[in-house]
Amino acid sequence: MSTSDHDRLLIIDFGSQVTQLIARRLRELNVYCEIHPFNLVDDAFLDAFGAKAVIFSGGPSSVFADGAPMPPASVFERGVPILGICYGQQVMMHCLGGKVERGHGTAEFGRAYVTPTAQKLDMLQGWFETDQDREQVWMSHGDHVSQIAPGFEVFGTSPNAPFAITADTTRHFYAVQFHPEVHHTPNGARLYENFVRLAGFKGDWTMGAYREEAIAKIREQVGSGRVICALSGGVDSSVAAVLIHEAIGDQLTCVYVDHGLMRKDESAQVVGMFREHYNLPLIHADESDLFLGKLEGVSDPETKRKIIGGLFIEVFEKYAKEIGGADFLAQGTLYPDVIESVSFSGGPSVTIKSHHNVGGLPERMNMQLVEPLRELFKDEVRALGHELGLPASFIGRHPFPGPGLAIRCPGEITREKLDILREADAVYIDQIRKHGLYDEIWQAFVAILPVRTVGVMGDGRTYDFACALRAVTSVDGMTADYYPFTHEFLGETATRIINEVPGINRVTYDITSKPPGTIEWE
């Protein structure tokens, strides 16, 4: 089965930072969906895509702005269900004859509560069933709908959004002012479940199906060509490598680049596992002197990422020539990598940081990219890894960034700081495993801070580095909360690091959520 054989849901992106979460909620329901920016969706695109239903995302724009993001008018004439979210609701009302007003004292940002009207709606099955007869939602809007379009009725209200939930049940158009995709709308998943049920989706998107489709796509793209795979030992690149090897066998050669930025003993573990257990063709390229030399004296995080991305390509091109010339470069790029790096014209999703798999790559490349995981979220990659037979202990490893410890070492990178960081990180992860917490945490690591602090050890004065412990819980990496360690755990861990790691005399714990922070420090 190819992706064209699935029921297809189109998400038209108007620039929301959380559009990918809409896709994630739909994937959890085994629905195949794609996200496309509004400015690339026209009548010809709609004809070719063949959507069974459409969702309008939120976005930062106002329908009053010059050149405001809008869908093609014909989308409302195709006889398919449409769900508008936040700005998507305002667009729907604006296009269909309703009215939107600027937010003067009616803006809502954050938690709000929606109460039902007397009318019943299939779309709200499972909502408003508690004793309080209201639902917590997450609002983020300035403008608001002041008059609904002809054919629509009101099914839910909030203090500052009298048309919080509206629907035209004849045409199966639904519109909500809040964001059901975020975790701050606890019952939001039920709305998506109801929407795809009413639209008649079969729910046939699974990782078993994706595996077969991806293998077919890889074979079609690569043909008889050779592929060189960037193997880091992380879950993403490892699943990509095993998937590609299953598709094309020894046309694949993996290159493990030791850039001097890996965790303690990681290089030996990765090389041993893939050579001995998976029997993958693997080149171990120790290029640590090259990378650390180019990074010497560099403090800016974006510059670090771009240097690392550029050097990766140089190294891969060099080893591709040594193995007889590879036509393709494989990477474990994921959906969140792309959404945090791409800003499309006219629907300004703000670029947060470049990723070494995406924005850090130079324009000049002598190989085509193979990115079989580009459409997947992290938990889908893990499910795919299970389908491919990778060990559960390996699939459950925490994410590790391509630039490695470079972005956990704010400021200038030195070999001394990297050695200290490796030891501190090893102690921290050992503590987490010892307390049985590893699988409860999405990602945990140590960052070594670019400051030295005064301390006292025994009768002597110390002047050593401070470090920050980081641990977060998340579903997909798009949003995250800090993990609530006990004070006893933090005290025990800090004591171990200070006693066992020369060069550290102060330990802090980072309790910043995402947003406003990012998971990594750089």
Curated annotation (Swiss-Prot):
Reactions mediated catalytically: XMP + L-glutamine + ATP + H2O = GMP + L-glutamate + AMP + diphosphate + 2 H(+)
The protein's Enzyme Commission number: 6.3.5.2
Stored Gene3D superfamilies: 3.30.300.10, 3.40.50.880, HUPs
Claim: Cell division is one of the keywords in the record: no
Annotated signal sequence range: none
Binding residues for ATP: 232-238
EC main group: ligase
Residues forming coiled coils: none
Domain GMPS ATP-PPase: 205-397
CDD domains for the chain: GATase1_GMP_Synthase, GMP_synthase_C
Cross-referenced PROSITE patterns: GATASE_TYPE_1, GMPS_ATP_PPASE
Protein task: Catalyzes the synthesis of GMP from XMP.
Subunit structure and binding partners: Homodimer.
Protein name: GMP synthase [glutamine-hydrolyzing]
Organism: Roseobacter denitrificans (strain ATCC 33942 / OCh 114)
